[in-house]
Amino acid sequence: MKKTTILSLTTAAVILAAYVPNEPILADTPSSEVIKETKVGSIIQQNNIKYKVLTVEGNIGTVQVGNGVTPVEFEAGQDGKPFTIPTKITVGDKVFTVTEVASQAFSYYPDETGRIVYYPSSITIPSSIKKIQKKGFHGSKAKTIIFDKGSQLEKIEDRAFDFSELEEIELPASLEYIGTSAFSFSQKLKKLTFSSSSKLELISHEAFANLSNLEKLTLPKSVKTLGSNLFRLTTSLKHVDVEEGNESFASVDGVLFSKDKTQLIYYPSQKNDESYKTPKETKELASYSFNKNSYLKKLELNGGLEKIGTFAFADAIKLEEISLPNSLETIERLAFYGNLELKELILPDNVKNFGKHVMNGLPKLKSLTIGNNINSLPSFFLSGVLDSLKEIHIKNKSTEFSVKKDTFAIPETVKFYVTSEHIKDVLKSNLSTSNDIIVEKVDNIKQETDVA
């Protein structure tokens, strides 16, 4: 039997520096030395996989799989085959439990030199894993992730599975937290499910953004907090359901709301109704709430609605008609963007707050009416492709009305219809184009026309 040499940390470091610089310490292989006092932060390697020591107490400790910097390098024999992360590894007389997946551990990056990079077809995560760190599976080529029975996983950090080729995943009951953009841009993801006894409480911002194959999702009753833009630019969802008994959220015909319905969070992009009316309780349309919808032609917003969020109707490509209520006070940035079929828009009297580029790229918009109490319009209020725009009606009569030099980026053929000489003067001094400005008399009998 080969005698094992025991070295002090100092001696081992000197020998390694002299003969194999920058190489990790190997464990449990015939040619490797075993460190007697493995420390927190040490990098060890076993079966070609690197681990980083997280804790040590006597002869037991914990490690993360992966060094936290570079991906695991799989061998040719592992390519396209299932791979299981070990529950424990042994280093000399010490036993370490694998409790975390390190950042970048199972990320995939094509080699810039053209060298073949091998990767397994599926990865099984043992019950001992409690955390998947940021970008742990970024760009992963595994089609399936499997969690062992009795999983203790509590946290999936930001971007853990983003840009992956994952096709399906069933998340364990123990999971409590899903980080920002955790599954975003995983374009092949078709099935994502939660355990019926899920403990999940928080899903962070854009966790399921930019997905093109996920058709349905049911949120567990345990969820208490959802981040913003959860389904931003996701193009495949037909309905989002909420498990019965959830105290924070509700689903009505596949549309996701806060429990009291005051916030409409998401109207699925592939929900195939051509018309829709928001519930009477709704006060806010969340950012990206109707984005990428492919069917909706007519939308009636309820009285009592106060706020339309950023990109709320972005790329709702079939939307032809929308009714905005007098209760509306805020329309955020790019709320109307890429609405290819919208022909007319009437902004009600009481809107006080506008984001930049609130209307951008409306190629079939012919007429815009700006309500009576709207006193100020921001930069880039109306911009982008506006090839069909013929007229803008400004109903305001106040001497406080103001616009900026770059409020209207519009064709010169567009005519303004205003209620007073003051409004005309405000426009004349700020327009960069020579648009007709027509002052409409109260009795509608006589009109005065001027060219700015």
Write out the residue ranges for each language-model feature.
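Consensus positions within tandem repeat domains that build extended binding/scaffold surfaces
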Residues: 104, 133-136, 157-160, 179-182, ...
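Structural signature of tandem-repeat unit edges
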Residues: 58, 78-99, 111-131, 140-155, ...
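Sec-dependent signal peptide cleavage junction
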Residues: 18-34
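Bacterial Sec-dependent N-terminal signal peptides
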Residues: 1-8, 22-24
